Amino acid sequence: MRLLLSILGVLTLLSILPLARSFLANQECFSEYRHCRMKCKANEYAIRYCADWTICCRVKKREAKKKIMW
């Protein structure tokens, strides 16, 4: 009986932790490269929702152009 209760307790704890982690996560976009908008621009991608249900957008990293040597 104790084993069953401990297994149920662990399962309950594991189901609560992701909810608490998402609740405690930072809900704002703090950076010069992140902005809350209704739609991301072509050079941005969505990260998360902001507090007012806008989308937190982050600028994509640019890939360096490779020169062909031959």
From Swiss-Prot:
One of its GO terms (biological process) is defense response to bacterium. It comes from the Eukaryota. It is found in: Secreted. Its main location: secreted. Coiled coil: none annotated. Keywords: Antibiotic, Antimicrobial, Defensin, Disulfide bond, Secreted, Signal. GO terms for cellular component: extracellular space. InterPro entries: Beta_defensin_dom (IPR025933). Residues 1-22 form the signal peptide. Disulfide bonds join 29-57, 36-50. Belongs to the beta-defensin family. Has bactericidal activity. This is Beta-defensin 43. It comes from Rattus norvegicus (Rat).
